[in-house]
Amino acid sequence: MDLRSLETKELIFKGLQEEHIKNPLIYGLTQKNAFALGKADYAPSDRNGLFVTPMGCSFFIVPLINAICRSGTMEEKALCFDAMLTMKAFNMILSNKRGHKQGEMERVVDQALRTLTNVKNRQTRAEEAGLTLLEKRVPAMIDNKVFVFSVGEEVDPNIRGLVANKMMAKYQRPVCVVSKLSDGTYAGSMRGFTKTGIESFKEVAETSPACIWVRGHDNAAGLCITDPEQFMQDMNAKLANISTEILYYVDYVFNAANINPNIILSLADANDYLGTGFDRPQIYIEEIELDSLTIMKGNTIKLSTFPGTEIMKFGATDEEVEKLSTFKGTMNAVCKPVKNEWCGNVKPQLMIIDYELVKSEPGIMAAWGF
């Protein structure tokens, strides 16, 4: 749903107000994930009366419903369906939680919330196993405009679309994950990548003689092909002029010494509106001096710039910390703007998405050997 449509936006805004969330299971998910939904990236503003933002919903509610539909057993699906009905959600049933006492009872909705989490964790483990398998094949096909992976049962058919989506986002090109059928053809899921100018990978795929059918949306569909290698070569020819270089689309470019904190705060306050068609703003910061580097708990990197805007990266590797601590030069970084609220104080922050290091040019004295 495109949030640039005023009608769509209004329907979403009405639906995400607390008084309109009547579904017991959905409301339970908002309570269970209240901490995550309140983080700076997802928290609603005070302007529109939202209880949950569209992005918060898409990250912490929708994936659990998606997981039960894709990876749940029929018994698990039936339980969660009952938890969506007011007339059944609050009925008492025998508890199945770990360590429960003999005859212990709990509400249908409480058991369903726990089941959703368990199924999502199960799906995530399967997804990570599939991604690990496919990552090993990437070096052999990195020069192709489209990745086509032929897999067996080692990648669960129910999550092939999710795996394709993750690979598409990482490598910024269309991805297909297919398996061989009994008739010798290959069927599976595809995901397109629109930011290189391919508005409908479905239409592009249908031009290949190796394509039997594509069914679904423009950039998220099922497909059937005769030969993965031939299909990939057809796509290479069709998309010959499309770049596969990793790109970042940014809204502002600042030198680190001239960051405008008011712009950072304004962009960070756009959470209510982010979603399909309205991406999170990104900012490119040049010439960040590493002299201000501070390594905090959990390998959190903090860089303090002249106007008082902190640039952060959480969960850096030990290798990153070592390199940044000893590097002689500056950093250029693509960042997302957030606002940090603590004890009533609001400060602008920039969270690093990706970065490059630029070595300092040796001064004339160093060049002369002094």
Description of each model-found segment:
Residues G99-V151, V155, D183-T185, E203-F370:
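Mid-to-C-terminal polyanion-binding domains and interfaces
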